[in-house]
């Protein structure tokens, strides 16, 4: 019975840590410090190895830290190379673990860096970004043919 109590306490503490991390970073423009967080930086270095410099070059021009569900993300592009040299880092903050993934678009190909070995197990954060870069960001600015916009009748 004591171990169940300890586990429940641990989960509550982890959930509080999760909420604190999300509250601290969501919407922040201090992306350099976010990317240098020990759990983020260490995992990126393990996943990317010699490609770490390429990732950082492709994140040179970036916005703030985005939040979707439990995932914090930073994406950007190399200077003057949007749609050609881009990257993303996705950090999914779960109660018992934090999952770090990254992807680089370079020379028309997307390379995913993750512990998961199958694409279907990648986060929605990565998959949505891949869909966006594969469209050349067109779907952000031009209405797709199968999308209708409806407004209330006055």
Give residue spans per PLM region.
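Mature extracytoplasmic domains of secretory-pathway proteins
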Residues: 42-104
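C-terminal partner/receptor-binding element of secreted or periplasmic proteins
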Residues: 15-29, 38, 108-154
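Sec/Tat signal peptide C-region and signal peptidase I cleavage site
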Residues: 9-13
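Unusually extended, aromatic-enriched hydrophobic runs near protein termini
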Residues: 6, 105-108
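Short, solvent-exposed loop/hinge segments that bridge or flank secondary-structure elements
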Residues: 31-33
């Amino acid at each position: 019975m004591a171990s169940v109590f300890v586990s429940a306490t641990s989960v509550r503490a982890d959930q509080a840590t999760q909420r604190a991390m999300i509250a601290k970073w969501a919407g922040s423009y201090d992306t350099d410090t976010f990317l240098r967080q020990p759990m983020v930086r260490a995992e990126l270095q393990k996943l990317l190895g010699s490609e770490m410099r390429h990732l950082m070059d492709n994140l040179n021009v970036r916005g703030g830290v985005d939040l979707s569900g439990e995932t914090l993300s930073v994406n950007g592009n190399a200077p003057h190379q949007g749609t050609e040299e881009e990257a993303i880092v996705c950090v999914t903050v779960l109660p018992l673990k934090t999952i770090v993934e990254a992807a680089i678009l370079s020379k028309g190909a997307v390379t995913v860096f993750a512990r998961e070995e199958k694409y279907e197990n990648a986060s929605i954060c990565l998959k949505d970004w891949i869909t966006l870069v594969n469209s050349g960001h067109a779907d952000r600015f031009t209405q797709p043919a199968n999308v209708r916009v409806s407004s209330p009748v006055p």
